[in-house]
C-alpha cells in the first residue's frame, strides 16, 4: 500500500464538480479515436465511473482496484462489467488481454511510474490512455508532489516501448495517449 492512494469516500469520486473537471465525453473521444476497440481494462476503477462510460459505448469492460469497497460500488453502478481486485503494478491478466487500458486519475498513485507503464504495456493490445491531474497546485486532487510531469510520463512511456506517446492538455486535466504500434495519425 502506498500513501499516494485515494482513501476517501466513494461518493466523492462521482461528485458533479469532479465529473465536470474530467470532461468525460472529450476523454472518451480521445481514447477511442483512430482505433477499433472491443475491450477495455479500467485500472483503479474506483466507483466505476469510467467503466460505466465505456460500457455505455458498447465496449466489454473489466475494472480492477485494490479496494474491495470500491469494487462493490463499481459492480452496483455497472452490473454488466467484470471487476477484479488487483494492483496496477502487477495486474492479474495475461499479456495483451485488452484493446485499451485506461487509467482515470490513478497513474500518479503508482509506486513506480516506469513499472506501472510497463505493466500497462504488457496487458494492452493497442493503446493505453491515462487521465491525470496537471502538474500544478489545485484545490482538488492530490498534492503537487504526487502529480506527474508530462515530460516524465512521455520519457518513461517511450522507454517502456510505446511506439507513440502523446500528451494532450485538456481544460483541467492532462491526458496521455500511448500506442503500442504506430497507428494512423490521430484524427480528432
Predicted feature descriptions by range:
Residues 100-112:
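A short SAM/SAH-binding and catalytic strip from SAM-dependent methyltransferases
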Amino acid at each position: 500500500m502506498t500513501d499516494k492512494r485515494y482513501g476517501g469516500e466513494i461518493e466523492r469520486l462521482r461528485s458533479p464538480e469532479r465529473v465536470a473537471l474530467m470532461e468525460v465525453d472529450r476523454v472518451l473521444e480521445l481514447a477511442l479515436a483512430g482505433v477499433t476497440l472491443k475491450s477495455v481494462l479500467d485500472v483503479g476503477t474506483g466507483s466505476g465511473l469510467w467503466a460505466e462510460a465505456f460500457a455505455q459505448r458498447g465496449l466489454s469492460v473489466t475494472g480492477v482496484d485494490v479496494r474491495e469497497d470500491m469494487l462493490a460500488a463499481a459492480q452496483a453502478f455497472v452490473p454488466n462489467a467484470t471487476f477484479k481486485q488487483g494492483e496496477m503494478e502487477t495486474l492479474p491478466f495475461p499479456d495483451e488481454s485488452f484493446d485499451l487500458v485506461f487509467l482515470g486519475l490513478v497513474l500518479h498513485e503508482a509506486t513506480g511510474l516506469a513499472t506501472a507503464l510497463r505493466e500497462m504495456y504488457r496487458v494492452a493490445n493497442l493503446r493505453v490512455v491515462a487521465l491525470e491531474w496537471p502538474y500544478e497546485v489545485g484545490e482538488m486532487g492530490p498534492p503537487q508532489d504526487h502529480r506527474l510531469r508530462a515530460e516524465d510520463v512521455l520519457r518513461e512511456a517511450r522507454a517502456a516501448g510505446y511506439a507513440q506517446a502523446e500528451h494532450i492538455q485538456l481544460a483541467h486535466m492532462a491526458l496521455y495517449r500511448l500506442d503500442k504500434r504506430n497507428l494512423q495519425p490521430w484524427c480528432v
